[in-house]
Amino acid sequence: MFSTAASPYDDLVIKATDENLASEDWALNMDVCDKVSSDGQNGARQAVTALQKRLSHRNPNVQIYALELANSLAQNCGKDLLGELSSRNWTSALDRLINDRATSTPVKKKALSFVKSWAKQIEETGDPNLGLMGELYDQLRAKNHVFDEPEPTPESAEEVRRRQEEEELQRVLELSKQDKGGRSLFTYQPSGSAGASSSSAANNNTSPSIPQSQAQPLAQDQAQSQAAPQVTGYAPQPQKIYSPQPLEPEPPRVDLNTATRVRAIYPFTGQEVGELDFERGDVIKVLDRGFKEWWRGACNGKIGIFPVTYVEALPEPTPKELQEKAQEEARVFASLGLVDQLLQTLKGIDPARGDKLDDHPEIEEMYQASVALQGQINTLIKKYSDQKAELEHMNANFIRAMGQYEELRNGPPLVQAQPFGYVPPQPQPLLQQQNSYSYQQYPQQPQQQPQPYAQAPYAQQAQPQLQPEQYAQQTPSPAAQSQASYTAQQQPYPAQVQQDPAAASPPPNQPFYHHGGSTTSVNRIPSAQTAVQPQPHGAPSFPPSSPPTRQVTEPGVAGLGAGDQQAWDQYYQQHGQQAPHSSQHPSQPQSQPQSQPQSQPQSQQGSYYPAHAQAQGYQAAYATVPDGRAYASPPLPGTQQGQGVEGVTAGMDRMSVHAP
């Protein structure tokens, strides 16, 4: 019940010092530094407490990662954290870690180096309250602990080559100062012997010619005989012939655009998904050069893109380097037996029986040898992680290429053939919108659809009866409807029946039906032979229409079909009208002529003929129903013409009678 609450830094520190990490995770270390900087002194205290717990861990990796994290905090989090590092708890934990015999040598070296650097850093602050770290440093130095400096970073191949070139240049300059251009081959002579030498030269010139092969030994003998008595105590030293040592073959310069391996010269942390993170000195295997500034590579078991400006080219490994790496790898795998032996020995020790590690010095030796293998094991883990990532990338590319190959080889999939004349159904979202637009703009006028003019006036053209669905598809546009409505309003008939808009306009979800009159020069009278189209609710009913039929009637009638008397009676009964019995309908306009043409027999004016009456009824029906065209008004009963020969000749007779 006295246990303290879990610190928010425990999880962060455990994650940053995980024993399974192959190397320090600097990204996690920076996250911890940022959090400590934002939390101030309280955050520094909690972070150092969490690090102190990790120092007591028995895994050397955890201890090394904890020391590295503490050093990162000391370099980035200011005076608050330096004060916590100078606390009694932290310095005591470091003292126990360094003086413990079970602590591995790499951990001791790193702890001693950090104690020295932290003591110097705290001393520079000048705060007298932070003297515990300096005291610890003095105590450890009094115990003859060696505070090794941090190991220098290994020189790169470029730096080694440059250093060798500078050394070779200095050596050549020293040799050039000692070299006199071959003058040491001649024997030194004092200035007093100049005359003798000149006289001897004259004697040589006046002497007879001697072969050159004999003259050279003679000249040498004369020079030696003259120089020997003149110079006393001088022994010419033999000339040192400079023989340059064979230099190591300079590694060939590798073009960055052709190199298969590159080394990072700057650390890089990716900001986007798919970017490769690496530290300075990491070797990256180049996999793809798809872009000019960004390449794809493998490093630390991951594959991603990296900036080209952050790396430098590496030459291919020489056979000697490959052999050394193979031998080192074989040594690591051969040491696995040592690790297994250490594990079995540790299992045989039981503290309950009183066994102690101090009684088994061989365990300490095996443990230290196993810890020394840790760095090599991590290197091999990175190597095989990169190879695994490369193989996975290769496998993915192979699967993609195999799929494309099969697709190209088998061809595109066959499209199922549709029957002839098949048209896929298409939705008509504007149908209801057009209908509602028509009814809302002109609610009092029934919508009509103009019929095209017939091309052959004397030929019977069958008008197909369309189904309601087809009528719905042939709904006129709003522009045509508005024009037809405007024309209907201009009709001069005073006896137009004003209908109720609610009764005249059909429901918005039902199609509109309209049977227009004939637009040809020959008027047609409907007949009952064709079935009457069903009228929607609320729409006015119209006379039944059918193609005209020729029947034998009384003389003087132009063969018009008499139609169905029962259908006409039903129509008049529905509208509350009476069948016409006179030649003039009451609803007929006064402007129409009252007399029949003279070409008609007088007996027809006073008598009632079925065809004549039906024509008058048809005219009355047209007077009650507004039509969208001025020419659609029916002709007078006396001037109705049929489609027969008699009707045509009768019209021609009237024209001849009334011609001016």
Curated annotation (Swiss-Prot):
SUPFAM superfamilies: ENTH/VHS domain (SSF48464), SH3-domain (SSF50044). PANTHER family: JAK PATHWAY SIGNAL TRANSDUCTION ADAPTOR MOLECULE. Gene3D superfamilies: 1.20.5.1940, 1.25.40.90, SH3 Domains. Residues 16-148 form the VHS domain. Residues 158-182 have a biased composition (Basic and acidic residues). Residues 190-230, 437-503, 573-623, 638-651 have a biased composition (Low complexity). The gene is HSE1. Residues 257-316 form the SH3 domain. Residues 517-533 have a biased composition (Polar residues). Component of the ESCRT-0 complex which is the sorting receptor for ubiquitinated cargo proteins at the multivesicular body (MVB). Residues 146-254, 437-660 are annotated as: Disordered. The keyword Protein transport applies. Residues 164-183 form the UIM domain. This is Class E vacuolar protein-sorting machinery protein HSE1. InterPro entries: ENTH_VHS (IPR008942), SH3-like_dom_sf (IPR036028), SH3_domain (IPR001452), STAM (IPR050670), UIM_dom (IPR003903), VHS_dom (IPR002014). GO terms for biological process: protein transport to vacuole involved in ubiquitin-dependent protein catabolic process via the multivesicular body sorting pathway. It holds the Pfam family VHS. Keywords: Endosome, Membrane, Protein transport, SH3 domain, Transport. Disulfide bonds: none annotated. GO terms for molecular function: phosphatidylinositol binding; ubiquitin binding. SMART domains: SH3 (SM00326), VHS (SM00288). It comes from Cryptococcus neoformans var. neoformans serotype D (strain JEC21 / ATCC MYA-565) (Filobasidiella neoformans). It is found in: Endosome membrane. Belongs to the STAM family. GO terms for cellular component: endosome membrane; ESCRT-0 complex. It is a peripheral membrane protein. Component of the ESCRT-0 complex composed of HSE1 and VPS27.
